[in-house]
Amino acid sequence: MMEHTAHDRELPIRPGWDSVVNIAESRSCFSRFQSCFARPQKLVVVIGLCLLLCSPPPGAQGLPTAADWKTLSNELSGRLHQGVPLARPCFSTYNGQPAAADEEECAAIRHRYLDAEFRANQYAGFYFAQGDGCISNTTNQCQLDPENLGASPGSGLPCNQGLVSPWYVDVRSASDVQSAFRFARRTGTPISIKASGHDYVNRHTLPGSLGLWTRNLRNMTYHATFRPAGVSGAEPVQAITFGSGVNSNEAQAFAGRNNVTLVGPSSATIAIVGGWTLFGGHSVLSPTLGLGVDRVLQIELVTPDGALRICNRQLHADLFWALRGAGAGTYGVVLSMTVRVEPATPVTLALLSFTPTLENQAPFLDLLINNTPAWSAGGWGGPMTSSSLALVSLEQDEAAAAQSMRAAADYVRGENGTVTIEQFPTYSEFYARYIAVSESYVGIGALPTLRVLPKRLHDQPQGRAELLAFLSQRARNNQTPYLFMTPPARYSTPRDSTSMHPAWRNSYWLAGFQSSYAWNASVAERREAAREDQTSARDLTALAPEGAAYPNEASPWHRDWRREFWGDDNYARLEAVKARYDPAGLLRCWHCVGFDDAWVHADPAFECMGAFDGLV
């Protein structure tokens, strides 16, 4: 069965797992975790822009010529486009030069500026302020005031290129990617890869790169029985093959129509095949069904040598291992991914929340810490804070769920909070009710830092005391702890079956905090947000040195990031795979495998993040 998704209207929601604090109503809970130039014949008009902005990797010689770009444009038959900031039509200057504003187009942009679906459907649409604007430079951006979208921006606001790649390819097939890699090998131009635009660390764009945009690879195929290619004796399983542009809403709706359960993101517009899966992918279902990477059966991608490859545990097994944990933007351009699904089954939700005060958060944190091992044994998974929880189980009916949650529910009722225990016929129906329709917070600078905590902090009295003291102090200081019972605590898999840090297999919680800054924050305010983020990362590491950081939601400036993301042994293997498949380093991204720490200050492409490195 083959299906191509339509551009159905969906309410945008915040990505990832950012916050569930102060739930006013149940639907908002999950949200708080969480082409300008298509005609090649006109290429010469703006070729000067890319000659100025496109930069080869360190050590490469020269820049692409006008002839190089013309050749690429002809090969791509109109799918090479100029990358222009989303809000450019609202400004009368661009990159320091006069530029005509387009009031009609600007009005349309202002109308949907905070719409995550709208942003996901534009190459220049990035979810967070640091996605297209330089975090350490207040003028190297082109953004609107999200609090005042009723009028065009004032004449004093800048509109500059920011981090948006000056050229991008609207990828529709493997041949488009192969053409891009030929161009990159010939000219030394680096490649960046963007699917949905959900990225706290900006791995999906790179100044001076040729961007590859995969949003329009939206094929979906259900397999009643799937065997990976070339894997003799493989047990057939239910699976779905997703193109790399399919987002979470589209994927879950498709899974529901095929009566299966899919482990996926808890944000409507995250691409299910992108960085969410390739860097791990934690979900409310992960304690029972594993991480996103644990569900992957086969990957189709184009590597930088231009080869179209099928990867699984038999074919290109080294690459398959590396992709499942460290694969985003690093080893090739993923075109599609086949993931295992399970038969649809009922799911029960426990949703509890109360208004936090200085006095009532520590007792609730104590309840969470002490009940987590038993809840994990009961199949519960999901997000929590010092005043709320939203846990899901495939194993509890409503009566069993009420019994399991009794202590926490009694406490919440005592604080005049709300308690909801509700069962749904399928996970897809739960997703449609609570996640697909959740509200959105786009356009802010969001800097989460989360850490995988070892089980000893829950299983041992001293560990529980240390964890409670740490989180309670942060809560008293008005730093909301974000706690995710989403590591694969009950899911059994061989230790080295993926390139994920081994600490994930010995954990109940992924926990941490978030710093933020406004779109128009001063450099000093942005630096302070970065300092707070780095302080949280340092303190979490001190609390749980044997834990790990999650590449998707770690501090962008994490110390010892190779060890913290993957572990020393894994990283050595990952680097060897990188050298084998991308020896020229055409794919570069911040703190990805192969990143050279010297680039932090030596490479202009990384200067925006690099300016705030080492504040703590």
From Swiss-Prot:
Keyword Flavoprotein: yes
Class of enzymatic activity (EC top level): oxidoreductase
EC numbers for this chain: 1.-.-.-
Signal peptide: none
One Pfam family of this chain: FAD_binding_4
Recorded GO MF terms: FAD binding; oxidoreductase activity
Summary of the knockout phenotype: Impairs the production of chaetoglobosin A but leads to the accumulation of 20-dihydrochaetoglobosin A.
Pathway of action: Secondary metabolite biosynthesis
Keyword annotations of the record: FAD, Flavoprotein, Oxidoreductase
Cofactors named for this entry: FAD
UniProt keyword annotation of Ligase present: no
Domain FAD-binding PCMH-type, chain residue ranges per copy: 160-344
The protein's name: FAD-linked oxidoreductase cheF
Organism: Chaetomium globosum (strain ATCC 6205 / CBS 148.51 / DSM 1962 / NBRC 6347 / NRRL 1970)
Gene designation: cheF
